[in-house]
Regions:
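Hydrophobic alpha-helical segments in the permease module
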Residues: 72-84, 173-175, 250-260, 266, ...
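Transmembrane helices of ABC transporter permease
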Residues: 69-76, 143-193, 266-277, 294
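Membrane-integrated ABC transporters
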Residues: 1-44, 59, 63-65, 87, ...
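Short, flexible cytosolic linker that couples an ABC transmembrane/permease module to its adjacent nucleotide-binding
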Residues: 303, 320-336, 376
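Juxtamembrane loop-to-helix connectors within ABC transporter transmembrane domains
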Residues: 50, 108-153
Length: 392
C-alpha cells in the first residue's frame, strides 16, 4: 500500500511539472485556438457561396453578381488557407518549444534513472518520448481536436436549414463518434503490446552494441542474432496487428462519412421535391455536414500518434516524479585534495545489505591508496560512492 501511495505521489509531482511547461506555452496555444476559430468560420464560405449561386445568380442570371461573389470567395479562401497554414506552423513551434524546454530535464532524469533502482526503462526511452509528443503536437490530430468543438455549431446551422437535415447530421455525428471511441478503446491494448515488443527488441540491440567485444569473443553472435530476430518478428507482428485493427476503423469511419454525406444529399433531394427547401440548401447542408464530421474522421486516422503521445506523457510523469530536478548547488571552495571516509556503509541501490561497512580511511594530497579484494567485496561500490554515483 505504501508503495502504491508513493508511486501516485511521484506521478502527481511529474504531472505538475509537465503542466507547468504547458502553461508556459499557453500564449501559443491561445493563438492557435484563435486561428482555429477563424478557419472554421471561413469554412462556411463554400456553403454560403452555393446558397448565393442558387438563390441569386441562377434566378437573376446576373454575370456581374457571379463575378463579385466568386472574387469574394477567392479572397476568403486565400485568407482561410493562410490562417490554416499559420496555425499549423504555430503548433509545430509549440512541439519544438516543448521538446526544447524539456530536453535537458529528460536527459538528466534518464541519466539519473540509469543508475537508480527506480529507473526501469532504457535512458533513451525518455528522449523518444519527447519525440513522440512533439510529433503529435505538430500533427493533424491536435488540430482536429481544436476543430471538434465546432461540430455542434455546424449541426445547429444544419438544423436551421431544416429539422430533418439536422436530425440526420446529428445521428451521423453520433455514429462516427461511437466508431472513433470504439476504435480508440479497441486499439489501445494492441498499441501497448506493439510498444512493449518494440522495446524488447531495442533492449537486445543495446545489449549487443554495449557488449559487442564479449559477444564476439565468447562466440555468442549467432545466439544473439537469433534472439534479436525473434524479438524483431514479435515487434513486427504486434505492429501489423495494431495497424490492421486501426486500419479497419479508419476505413469504416471514412466509408461511413461518405455514405452519410450521400444520405444527406438524398434526404435533401427528397425535401427539394417536396418544395420544403431549395437546391442551394441541399448542397450547402451536405458540405457543412462533411466539414462537421471531418475532425472525427481525422482523429480516427491519428490513433497511433495520439496514443503514443499519451503513453509518452504518462512515462515522463513517472520519470520526472521519481527523478526530481536537481537543485542548484552553491559554489564551494576549491577542494584541497584531502579525502576522508568515516564509517562508510554502501552497497548496490537495489539491495538492503551493504557490501562495505564501517570503512574508514584518509588520503592526503600526494598520497596513494591501493584497494584489493576478491570479486564482489565492494571495490566498485566504493569507487561509485566516492564519485557520487551511489549514495552511502
Amino acid at each position: 500500500m505504501k508503495l502504491i501511495l508513493s508511486s501516485l505521489a511521484q506521478k502527481k509531482e511529474g504531472k505538475a511539472e509537465l503542466a507547468l511547461i504547458f502553461r508556459t506555452l499557453r500564449k501559443h496555444l491561445l493563438y492557435v485556438f484563435g486561428f482555429s476559430c477563424w478557419v472554421n468560420l471561413l469554412m462556411l464560405t463554400g456553403p454560403i457561396f452555393m446558397l448565393q449561386v442558387y438563390e441569386r445568380v441562377l434566378s437573376s442570371r446576373s454575370e456581374q453578381t457571379l463575378l463579385v461573389l466568386f472574387s469574394l470567395v477567392v479572397a476568403l479562401y486565400a485568407i482561410m488557407g493562410s490562417l490554416d497554414y499559420i496555425r499549423g506552423q504555430v503548433m509545430a513551434r509549440v512541439g519544438a518549444l516543448f521538446q526544447d524546454r524539456l530536453s535537458d530535464r529528460a536527459f538528466n532524469a534518464a541519466l539519473a534513472g540509469a543508475v537508480s533502482p527506480e529507473g526501469k526503462r532504457a535512458p533513451a526511452a525518455a528522449l523518444r518520448d519527447l519525440d513522440s509528443i512533439q510529433a503529435a503536437l505538430a500533427g493533424p490530430g491536435c488540430l482536429a481536436i481544436l476543430d471538434l468543438p465546432w461540430l455542434p455549431i455546424y449541426l445547429i446551422i444544419i438544423y436551421l436549414f431544416h429539422p430533418w437535415l439536422g436530425i440526420l447530421a446529428t445521428a451521423a455525428a453520433i455514429l462516427l463518434i461511437i466508431v472513433a471511441l470504439l476504435g480508440e478503446l479497441t486499439t489501445k491494448k494492441k498499441q501497448q503490446a506493439a510498444l512493449q515488443a518494440d522495446g524488447g527488441s531495442r533492449i537486445v540491440e543495446n545489449t549487443v552494441w554495449r557488449d559487442a567485444e564479449a559477444v564476439l569473443a565468447l562466440g555468442m553472435r549467432q545466439n544473439f542474432a537469433k534472439l534479436w530476430r525473434n524479438k524483431k518478428q514479435e515487434a513486427q507482428k504486434a505492429r501489423l496487428d495494431h495497424n490492421g485493427l486501426s486500419g479497419k476503423f479508419r476505413t469504416t469511419a471514412k466509408s461511413l462519412r461518405l455514405l452519410l454525406q450521400s444520405a444527406m444529399l438524398a434526404l435533401g433531394a427528397l425535401l427539394v421535391l417536396k418544395t420544403e427547401i431549395t437546391p442551394g440548401v441541399m448542397i450547402a447542408a451536405s458540405i457543412i455536414m462533411g466539414r462537421a464530421l471531418a475532425p472525427v474522421d481525422q482523429l480516427t486516422g491519428s490513433y497511433s500518434a495520439l496514443q503514443n503521445a499519451r503513453s509518452a506523457l504518462h512515462d515522463l510523469e513517472i520519470l520526472f516524479g521519481s527523478m526530481p530536478a536537481e537543485e542548484s548547488k552553491p559554489l564551494l571552495p576549491r577542494p584541497n585534495g584531502l579525502i576522508t571516509v568515516s564509517k562508510l556503509a554502501v552497497g548496490p541501490p537495489e539491495t538492503r545489505d551493504p557490501l562495505v561497512r564501517g570503512l574508514e580511511f584518509s588520503i592526503r594530497p600526494g598520497e596513494a591508496l591501493g584497494i584489493i579484494g576478491p570479486s564482489g567485496s565492494g571495490k566498485s561500490s566504493l569507487a561509485r560512492t566516492l564519485a557520487g554515483i551511489w549514495k552511502p
